[in-house]
Each structure stands twice: as structure tokens, then as C-alpha cells.
Amino acid sequence: MPFININEIKPKEVVPGFSGRFIHSEHTTVAHWEIKAGASIPFHQHVHEMIVNVITGKLELTVGDETKVLEAGMGAVIPSNVPHKATGVTDCKVIDVFYPVRQDYNN
């Protein structure tokens, strides 16, 4: 089925304040996040390449040792196995693209 209504996908709270709806293809995962102000994902890393796209609000993102507050229209490219963390400065919506598929989000 090539067409998806993201609103029909049940959200999954991965950590408190980070709720995601996930779309999977054969090779990629797209995560539609709703992030609450003050919610954080601590430093972590994974084998997946990741592209971050802020849609609304503000997100503080640290990649390696560099930190920036991203606003709507801004993003970041995070290579495989690079430590990163994120905090909602405001309530925000973010779309992340992962390669390869995030099997841990595929349930």
C-alpha cells in the first residue's frame, strides 16, 4: 500500500515527552515526532544515519560536541555512530529519517 495517513498510526512514547509515529520502507524509517517542551533524549548513538527536520517549535540538538537550537525549517545530518541528544525547547514537531530501518521502532 503506497499511501499512508500518519494520523491513523498509533503514536509510541519512546521516552517521556517524545511520541512518535513511524513509517517503514524496505530500507528506511521515517519518524514523525511530537516533543513536549523540556522533554529530553539523553546522549546515545546508533548505526543508523539520521536526518533531523524541525517542522514547528524549537529543538536543542547536540551532535558530538556541537549544540544548536533548531527552529522550523532547520535540520541536521547525523552520521552513523555519532553521539547525539535532543531537548524540546518548546513543544515541537520533528521528522527524522533513518537508514537503515529502525527495527526497534517497527512494532
Locations of the language-model features?
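Short, conserved beta-strand element in jelly-roll/cupin
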Residues: 34-35, 46-61
